[in-house]
Curated annotation (Swiss-Prot):
Family statement drawn from the similarity comment of this UniProt entry: Belongs to the bacterial ribosomal protein bL35 family.
Annotated Gene Ontology cellular component terms: cytosolic large ribosomal subunit
Keywords tagged on the record: Ribonucleoprotein, Ribosomal protein
GO biological process: translation
One annotated GO molecular function: structural constituent of ribosome
Highest taxon of the lineage: Bacteria
Protein name (record): Large ribosomal subunit protein bL35
InterPro entries noted in UniProt: Ribosomal_bL35, Ribosomal_bL35-like, Ribosomal_bL35_CS, Ribosomal_bL35_sf
Renumbered residue ranges of the record's region Disordered: 1-26
Length: 65
C-alpha cells in the first residue's frame, strides 16, 4: 500500500501539540487592520486550540502528525 499524503494546506496551518491537541493561528489578522482597535489586534496574537468538532477532519489531513 502506498504512503498516505499529508495535505500541504493543513501542514502550513496547524501544529500538533505533544499533549495531542491541535493549535491554529487566529483569523482576521492579515490586512485591513487600520479599522481594528489595538485591543482587538492584540487579542488576535498567538495560537488557539482547534474546536473538538473540527479535530477529526484535521487529523485525517495530517496522517503522520
Amino acid at each position: 500500500m502506498p504512503k498516505m499524503k499529508t495535505k500541504s494546506s493543513a501542514k502550513k496551518r496547524f501544529k500538533v501539540r505533544s499533549s495531542g491537541g491541535i493549535k491554529r493561528s487566529q483569523a482576521f489578522k492579515r490586512h485591513i487592520l487600520t479599522k481594528k482597535t489595538t485591543k482587538s489586534k492584540r487579542q488576535l496574537r498567538g495560537m488557539t486550540e482547534v474546536h473538538a468538532s473540527d479535530e477529526k477532519l484535521i487529523r485525517a489531513m495530517l496522517p503522520y502528525a
